[in-house]
Design a protein with these regions (language model features):
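C-terminal catalytic "cap/lid" subdomain
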Residues: 1-242
């Protein structure tokens, strides 16, 4: 297809939706959706079952086994999705379904490389109305897509995905100059975005403390947890993400 990597997955899900299919099977070169990248972590293993939301979060935040949009048509028609290996079909795979709860609540880890962190800062933000709207209007004008966002009294930090320096090409002097008409701007590169994906992570006691204590030896930036019950994300220096 013309949809890029994983586009055939999305096409299959759209066809399943159009045909009112009960299930959609996606055959790849891996035996299901893994807990993390097995090339980095030998202990990684396929998950027997995932919810639509968990799979969508994993695809969005770096898991390459599925196209991020694949879950949309499946979710609309409640179509079960199976992911397995065409080379080793006897090994089974992962079923992706509407409702799925497993222990522990954190179930997988993804990584998205080449992230850019932008921090905009001005004392005027404390009392000004519409400041964020101005900032994100400039970002949208230059066709930049924001992922994580954190705020303080006088500053806002946000991340931009930067595959093959595509963001660097658009986050140019013109963009920064326009932002600097309303605030100070700091651009930092060399980060990877790590996301822990699971279910009911907001309500499970001690989940965030366990995750953060496991990475306490590393300098984390932009810890984001709470907007979605299925993930906790943070930036880490690209030299530490493995």
């Amino acid at each position: 297809t013309t949809l890029g990597r994983g586009g055939s997955d999305f096409t299959a899900a759209l066809l399943a939706e159009a045909l009112d299919a009960e299930s959609c099977e996606i055959w790849t070169d891996v035996t299901g959706v893994y807990t993390t990248d097995p090339r980095i972590t030998p202990a990684a293993h396929p998950l027997p079952e995932l919810s639509f939301e968990e799979a969508a979060e994993m695809a969005t935040f770096g898991a390459k086994v599925l196209h991020p949009a694949t879950m949309e048509p499946a979710l609309r028609k409640d179509i079960k999705v199976f992911v397995g290996s065409s080379k080793e079909p006897e090994k089974g795979g992962t079923w992706i379904v509407r409702d799925c709860e497993h222990e522990p609540p954190y179930r997988a880890i993804t990584r998205r490389k080449e992230q850019v962190m932008v921090t905009v800062k001005t004392p005027k933000m404390m009392y000004a109305q519409g400041f964020l709207q101005q900032v994100f209007a400039i970002i949208a004008k230059h066709k930049l897509s924001v992922d994580l966002v954190t705020t303080s009294e006088i500053s806002v930090s946000f991340t931009l995905d930067n595959p093959a320096n595509s963001v660097a090409q658009r986050l140019n002097k013109e963009t920064i100059a326009e932002l600097e008409t309303i605030c100070d701007v700091k651009v930092e590169k060399g980060y990877d975005l790590v996301t822990v994906v699971g279910n009911n992570m907001q309500t499970a006691i001690g989940v965030s403390s366990k995750i953060l204590s496991a990475v306490s030896d590393f300098n984390l930036r932009m810890i984001c947890f709470g907007a979605n019950p299925h993930n906790l994300s943070f930036l880490v220096n690209e030299t530490d993400s493995d």
